[in-house]
Curated annotation (Swiss-Prot):
GO terms for cellular component: cytoplasm; endomembrane system; membrane. GO terms for molecular function: lipid binding; metal ion binding. GO terms for biological process: lipid transport. This is Synaptotagmin-4. Pfam families: C2, SMP_LBD. May be involved in membrane trafficking. Belongs to the synaptotagmin family.
């Protein structure tokens, strides 16, 4: 009996083990098949698929998704042919770049040419390529190549000063990183299947180089190093940086539609600067500003010099052509005028044009920095105030622009004015650069000084006896409010009317003072142009007081236009 029971138990256990093993094998096979399917699915996934499926915090910090594909194969082939590219391209680049440098040669130099130019033995590395479907359109292909070059070229500049001194200057330690854009357009049914190639530097991520006088020191001649470096950077910035592009016809045809064309006009008023860094050992700086979108000599505007001031007021208006509002920017540089010597840079600032709303005035204060590319300057160099108004081409009639000559026309003159006058895109440059009639806008400006709040305490009792002086700078007319005693939050609600003879070039100043029996102390001020009130007709706003530790001033402005005249010049 015991034997039979043991036999039964043995058979049952063996059968159970066989069933369990078969079950396990089936489950394992199913899991392996599922895992193989999952791995195959992951293998077919693109980078975009993985970014959609998995959250951003799932990836470690060292994982970077690039929109560009690697080009190791191209770099290997480029290294092989680079010696031949160096021989073939050096002279071609030299002859092409020299005329560009001549356009940007600074006034302190008589000439700037190459005496030697070779690309060296180190080939550039293409780190990525991408096709821009959104930019290509149905009739073209747009490609972007990311390039890095730490080369060893042999570049020697022959620099001649106005005094006739010739200096051989070597450009060394060149490092460049950027993105080039290639446009194959239009697509045609004739080999090589595109009519022209356009190329441009879409993004300049980094450009470093050093200058050295062969057999001497560049610092021995003040200003030369900065002038040459600025010339090289400006030439690169304006000659091939997007939206500027070079067009190479591949097949015969008219490719004028690929050329850079104006898309609008930018009105810029350089109002003032404050708290500028002092560059003079004795006295104060003599600041002036230059403004440009493209740093061509005929497209760079310069204000007058304000002597011995760290808080200059210019209030000067300039006009600029805009070719690509999405990528271009306005640059302002403030210098200290040194007379016969070279000017010293106080600071610079930039405004992207894509931040501007067409037809709406943008009043902005910009912090000045030493280098616009590095942006690591912590030193206080001051601020500059700009007033910007962008008008797209073809929409001038629907947007109010007091700087436009049509703004000063009477209703009858607008009816009689021919439609075709300066309306085409090809006439935009002529319209902006030509000397046109000055626009004179007359009217009545009503200024209501409403109130102030949070004024700094200037009296011994912790109060202030505040009043406001209102001044129109050009007409030199003044008015002042009553004194509100013992208050840091005075309320005036007083209105003053001013007859303005030239509103576009006038400036409104409101100065808050503390009244004392033995004198008066200035608390702070607000300076503004009349452009906004001319466009909006009427507005009320709180303004921060410049020169004060704290405090704001509430002002209500109203503009009533009068007879508008045109002054022939």
């Amino acid at each position: 009996m015991g034997f039979l029971f043991g036999l039964f138990i043995g058979i049952a256990v063996s059968f159970g083990l066989v069933v369990a093993f078969a079950r396990y094998s089936s489950v394992r096979s199913t899991r392996r098949a599922d895992l193989a399917k999952t791995i195959a699915a992951f293998a077919r996934m693109t980078v975009q698929d993985s970014r959609k499926l998995l959250p951003g915090d799932f990836y470690p910090s060292w994982v970077v998704f690039s929109q560009r594909q690697k080009l190791n194969w191209l770099n290997l082939e480029l290294e092989k042919i680079w010696p031949y590219v160096n021989e073939a391209a050096s002279e071609l680049i030299k002859s092409s770049v020299e005329p560009v440098l001549e356009q940007y040669t600074p006034a302190m130099l008589a000439s700037l040419k190459f005496s030697k130019f070779t690309l060296g033995t180190v080939a550039p590395q293409f780190t990525g390529v991408s096709i821009l479907e959104s930019e290509s359109g149905p009739n073209g292909i747009t490609m972007e190549l990311e390039m890095q070059w730490d080369g060893n070229p042999k570049i020697v500049l022959d620099v001649k000063t106005l005094l006739g001194v010739s200096l051989p200057i070597e450009v060394k330690n060149i490092g460049f990183t950027g993105v080039f854009r290639l446009i194959f357009k239009p697509l045609v049914d004739e080999f090589p299947c595109f009519g022209a190639l356009s190329y441009s530097l879409r993004e300049k991520k980094g450009l470093d180089f050093t200058l050295k006088v062969i057999g001497g020191e560049l610092t021995s001649i003040p200003g030369i190093s900065d002038a040459i470096e600025e010339t090289i950077r400006d030439a690169i910035e304006d000659s091939i940086t997007w939206p500027v592009r070079k067009i190479i016809p591949i097949l015969p045809g008219d490719y004028s539609d690929l050329e850079l064309k104006p898309v609008g006009k930018l009105d810029v008023k350089v109002v003032q600067a404050k708290d500028l860094a002092n560059k003079d050992m004795i006295g104060k700086s003599d600041p002036y500003a230059i403004v440009f979108i493209r740093p061509l000599p005929d497209r760079t505007k310069k204000t007058k010099t304000i002597s011995n001031s760290l808080n200059p007021i210019w209030n000067e208006h300039f006009e600029f052509i805009v070719e690509d509002v999405s990528t271009q920017h306005l640059t302002v540089r403030v210098f200290d005028d040194e007379g016969v010597g070279s000017s010293q840079l106080i600071g610079a600032a930039q405004v992207p044009l894509n931040e501007l709303v067409p037809g709406k005035v943008k009043d902005i204060w910009l912090k000045l920095v030493k280098d616009l590319e590095i942006q690591r300057d912590t030193k206080n160099r001051g601020q500059v105030q700009l007033e910007l108004l962008y008008c797209p081409l073809g929409k001038e009639g629907g947007l109010k622009n007091p700087f436009n000559p049509d703004y000063s026309l009477t209703i009858l003159e607008k009816v009689l004015k021919p439609e075709s006058e300066d309306s085409d895109a090809t006439d935009m440059k002529k319209l902006v650069t030509s000397k046109k009639k000055d626009v004179i806008v007359r009217g009545v400006l009503s200024v209501t000084v409403v109130a102030a709040e949070d004024l700094p305490a200037v009296d011994f009792m912790g109060k202030a006896d505040a009043f406001v002086v209102i001044t129109l700078k050009k007409s030199e007319t003044k008015s002042k409010t009553r004194v509100v005693p013992d208050s840091l939050n005075p309320v005036w609600n007083q209105t003053f009317d001013f007859v303005v003879e030239d509103a576009l070039h006038d400036l409104l100043t409101l100065e808050v003072w503390d009244h004392d029996k033995f004198g008066k102390d200035k608390i702070g001020r607000v300076i503004m142009t009349l452009t906004r009130v001319m466009l909006e007709g009427e507005f009320q706003e709180w303004f921060e007081l410049d020169g004060a530790k704290s405090g704001k001033l509430c002002v209500h402005l109203k503009w009533t236009p009068r007879l508008k005249l045109r002054d022939a010049s």
